[in-house]
Structure formats: C-alpha cells, structure tokens
C-alpha cells in the first residue's frame, strides 16, 4: 500500500489509495522473494536510524511490524476517529486486530474491548492495553458488548477481519453516531446498509497509510519503547518454508509468521 507522495490521495494522507501507480500490481514486484522492485522509494520508504546490529531482535521485529500490521491497526483507529476517553471494540484477534488495540490505546481510548476466542491472543491483547475480552460471536457477542456498555454500544468499532459476520458485528455494536473503521480485506456478501440508516453510523476504511503513519507517529513510538508490536510475530520461518508459515497462521498455530532471509 505504498504511495507516490505526490497525487491527491497521498497529499491527503491516504496513500493506500495512491493514484500514482497501478494498485493491481502492488504485490507483483518480488514482495515474497529475495529482492523487491519498490516504486516511489524516494518518498515511500522509511529510513531507520543506524544499522541492524544496533537493535535487539525484539526491536527489529517491532520495526518490521511497521511495514504492515501496525499501520493497518492504526488506520482502523484513525478513520474511526478514536479519541481520548472513548470506549472502543476491536473485532478480530489476528496481528492487525492486536495492533488495533495498541493504536486505540495510543489515541487515548479509556476502554478497549477485544472480541477474541484464543487464549494466547487474549493474553497479548491484555498486555497491549485491552480492558475486556468477549469470546462470544454473532448475536451472543453483540449482546455481550452491549451488556458491557450498558446498552449504549461503543464509540468506535475497529473491524479487522473482513467477513460477513465480523462486519455485521461491528455495525451492530456501534452506538448511534459512532464510527466503524474497516481494515479487514472484505470477503462479504451484500450487506443491507439501510438497516443501519437510523444509526447514523460512519463507515470508513481501506488500505492503510503506512508511510504517513510510520513517519508521523509509529516509528518514534517504537524507537522510544512506547509500543512493542513485534510481539505479534510468534514463529520464524525460512523463505523456503513460506507455505508452512501461511498454513500455521491459517490453523492458528502462530499469530504472525516472520520470514527470515538466510
């Protein structure tokens, strides 16, 4: 989701929708190989001070998280306009959802509810700043979030999965006038938005503004030790084992796989 830095989208801080290059080729220039052809690198690459040897493995993992999952979680919180004192719900406990917890806390959320059914992810979410865990899904999950918020619903719902169920859940738990930040890649059927007309909900989201967030907020937060998103990487694999890395994520054997180039 890198941008050119010059088009209207990039100038507005939404380089995930960059008009300066063909987004359909975003993943066709060697992004899972030893070398990458990176367009618009003069603007979109983010320089990290010093040398790799200056940093611990944990710090390098957190810096790597700035290439995708942390900015994506931050994007959900930004477009949902999470503010100080808000009650926020995060739908999804993958790496992006966990980073959305970090982002909500960074932006001052007072209460952060994560919808999660996996113990290892629940523990990490609590470490990152979540205050409540909701294991239920569907109507039961919606009812639980509403119970936790005295029937009001949340000020912001961060949808980090992209399924029909997760999207409908995010819409159902948002209070009237709330915002839904959608960063889960959509794989949904038709959703009848007329059902939510009287809710006055704001729905926003899409590919994250990685470069903008890294340069303005996230790189400094990592280097200063304020956040540690690299903890989402729970297994490492060689490039030759990339198929296994994907399989283990799909089977919930790891939260986020790290590919190490030998």
Feature annotation, model-predicted:
Residues 4-91:
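NAD(P)H dinucleotide-binding glycine-rich loop of Rossmann-like/cofactor-binding domains
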Residues 80-82, 149, 161, 173-175:
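A generic alpha-to-beta junction signature in SAM-dependent methyltransferases
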Residues 90-93, 105-169:
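Adenosine-nucleotide cofactor-binding segment
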Residues 97-98:
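N-terminal Rossmann-fold NAD(P) dinucleotide-binding loop
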Residues 117-118, 186, 209:
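Residues in the short beta-alpha loop(s) of Rossmann-like NAD(P)-binding domains
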Residues 168-172, 212-262:
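C-terminal hydrophobic helical "lid"/dimerization subdomain
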Residues 172-189, 203-204:
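ADP-ribose/adenylate-binding Rossmann-like module
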Residues 184-199, 215-219:
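Rossmann-fold NAD(P)-binding glycine/threonine-rich loop
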């Amino acid at each position: 989701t890198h941008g050119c830095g010059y088009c209207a989208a990039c100038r507005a801080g939404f380089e995930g929708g960059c008009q300066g290059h063909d987004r359909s080729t975003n993943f066709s220039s060697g992004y899972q190989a030893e070398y990458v052809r990176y367009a618009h690198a003069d603007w979109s690459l983010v320089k990290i001070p010093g040398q790799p040897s200056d940093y611990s493995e944990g710090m390098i993992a957190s810096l790597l998280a700035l290439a995708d999952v942390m900015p994506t979680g931050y994007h959900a919180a930004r477009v949902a306009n999470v503010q100080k004192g808000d009650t926020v719900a995060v739908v999804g406990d993958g790496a992006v959802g966990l980073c959305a917890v970090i982002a909500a806390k960074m932006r001052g959320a007072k209460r952060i509810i994560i919808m999660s059914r996996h113990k290892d992810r629940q523990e990490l979410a609590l470490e990152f700043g979540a205050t409540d865990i909701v294991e239920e899904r569907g109507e039961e999950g919606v009812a639980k979030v509403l119970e936790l918020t005295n029937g009001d619903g949340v000020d912001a719902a961060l949808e980090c999965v992209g399924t029909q169920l997760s999207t409908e859940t995010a819409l159902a738990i948002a209070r009237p006038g709330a915002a839904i930040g959608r960063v889960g890649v959509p794989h949904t059927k038709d959703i009848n938005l007329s059902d939510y007309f009287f809710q006055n909900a704001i729905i926003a989201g899409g590919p994250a503004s990685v470069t903008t967030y890294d340069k303005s907020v996230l790189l400094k937060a990592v280097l200063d030790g304020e956040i540690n998103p690299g903890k989402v990487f729970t297994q490492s694999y060689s490039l030759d084992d990339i198929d296994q890395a994907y399989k283990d994520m799909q089977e919930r054997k790891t939260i986020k796989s790290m590919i190490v180039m030998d």
